[in-house]
Amino acid sequence: MSRPTRLVIEPSALLHNLSQIKHLAPGKKVIAMVKANAYGCGVREVAPVLDGRIEAFGVACLEEALAIRALGVETPCILFQGVFSSDELSVAVENDFACVLHHAQQLEWLIKTPLPYPIKVWVKVNTGMHRLGFKIHELQKVMGALQTCTWVDKSIGLMTHLACADEPHRPENQQQISLFQEISIPGFRQRSIANSAAIISFPDSQADVVRPGIMLYGVSPFANQNAHDLGLIPVMRFMSAISAIHDNPSFAQVGYGGTWKSDKPSRIGVVAAGYGDGYPRHISEKTPVWVRGREVSIVGRVSMDMLTIDLTEHPDVEIGDEVELWGTHVLVERIAKSAGTVGYELLCQISERVRYK
């Protein structure tokens, strides 16, 4: 039997979340963000489920788009960081990948690299995040260059990204939305601004195309709301099993550094999962896992391959019992808060040795 640490991906949850997105953004096209191996959920598992149900897949780079094509998936892909060299343009157009242009070097490469077919492009404009994107006053010149380039498809899109959408009260959100909506340069056939948080909090930002990421996988983009609050279902269940159980005397120290001990006899379960699998090492006291229909607290330090749980009050738990580290019952948002991070990071840091099932 192989090591029990695994990811269980729920296609029905993925489709439920997509339905929720379409309910929140009726009539809008959907670009499903599947960068970083579909936020750790596995592009092999996710892309075939969404194929034909969305407008396009959003990826970070050419390699991620090619991995989707290798699955036999025909839905278009958009390279959100565009190309990193002029050589990538020919590969992109041959595979019908659209490219985001966000700086002058990319535009120059495109204008100076004749292509056999028209390539679809999106122009990214900086409205306040100050990370990627052309300045607003540069857009007229950019559009002029694209419209005169014979190997650029005329369905040019315009997009921007909100810096603070996960904090809806921040005034920067409406400032960015207003700046974007005020852009009146002709030639842009479709517009996009809304990520997961904006889809939920700023309906006026939905424009023509929305770009859900984290909410597609059943995780909240907000610190003060979880997936259940938003009607989302977690797609990823991070699972393992109990590999050993020990009855310890009073004051027995558990784990590295002996950071946990009980003043009474204790029953300690060992779970086959640790930070080598992507579970966070630094978590707050009494962070739970789910065993036999209840929460059980982690005790002691998380190690590379194992963590330990307090079974003193749970005599029915046995070796081999299934353990949910996060997922349907223990939401990843809760573990992220305990670890002082965000759900995005935890999903994306699952290690390669964890198998998908």
From Swiss-Prot:
List of catalytic residues: K35 (proton acceptor), Y256 (proton acceptor)
Gene3D superfamilies reported in the protein's UniProt record: Alanine racemase, Lyase, Ornithine Decarboxylase, Chain A, domain 1
Residues where N6-(pyridoxal phosphate)lysine is found: K35
Alphabetically ordered keywords of this record: Isomerase, Pyridoxal phosphate
Superkingdom as given in the UniProt entry: Bacteria
Record-level GO BP terms: D-alanine biosynthetic process
Annotated metabolic or biological route of this protein: Amino-acid biosynthesis; D-alanine biosynthesis; D-alanine from L-alanine: step 1/1
Enzyme Commission code(s) on record: 5.1.1.1
Residues the record lists as binding substrate: R131, M304
Enzyme class (EC, first level): isomerase
Catalytic activity reported: L-alanine = D-alanine
Annotated signal sequence range: none
Pfam short name (any one): Ala_racemase_N
Cofactor dependence: pyridoxal 5'-phosphate
Molecular function GO labels: alanine racemase activity; pyridoxal phosphate binding
Cellular component terms (Gene Ontology): cytosol
Family membership noted in the UniProt record: Belongs to the alanine racemase family.
Function of the protein: Catalyzes the interconversion of L-alanine and D-alanine. May also act on other amino acids.
Name of the featured protein: Alanine racemase
